[in-house]
Amino acid sequence: MTGREFEQYMCKLFDKNGFWALNIPRNESGAQPFDIVAIRGDEVYTIDCKVCSGAARFPLSRVEDNQLLAFEKVFWRTNAKIGFMVYWSGEIYFLRRADIVKAIENKQASIKLTYNDLFCTVVNEVF
């Protein structure tokens, strides 16, 4: 699955679960901090979608400075769930802002994808 396909999949998945979901268009530099905003009532997600292969880890080198800044601005102003949706080996993991920030502060190179972070398994019926 490509990154663009994963973004489209996540929008459809949110939509099927009663969310209004917007895949944010890329600007000329491609540097928007989030790929998707999804809202259902008071529940809000602001997420960036990443596709990983190889080991079950998310390399923190893939986190951009503008994303960290946006994470903090959204965190301090909303109750949104903020972070990365990571597609790996047919499963989707949600890495939360707090875990990402903590790992960066601890100078970790990556975050292990674990069962605790599992958001869902990819289901083809969404398409």
Regions found by a protein language model. Give the residues of each.
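Mg2+/Mn2+-dependent nuclease catalytic core
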Residues: 52-70
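N-terminal prepro-regions of secreted/extracellular proteins
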Residues: 102-104, 108-110
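Acidic-basic catalytic patches of nuclease active cores, encompassing PD-(D/E)XK
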Residues: 1-27
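Conserved catalytic cores of phosphodiester-cleaving nucleases, focusing on short active-site segments
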Residues: 36-38, 42-55
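Active-site metal-binding core of divalent-cation-utilizing nuclease and nuclease-like domains
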Residues: 20-42
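Charged phosphate-binding loop/patch that engages nucleotide di/tri-phosphates or the phosphate backbone
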Residues: 109-127
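Short connector loops at helix/strand junctions that flank enzyme active sites
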Residues: 31-33, 42-46, 66, 77-79
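Nucleic-acid nuclease catalytic cores
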Residues: 72-100
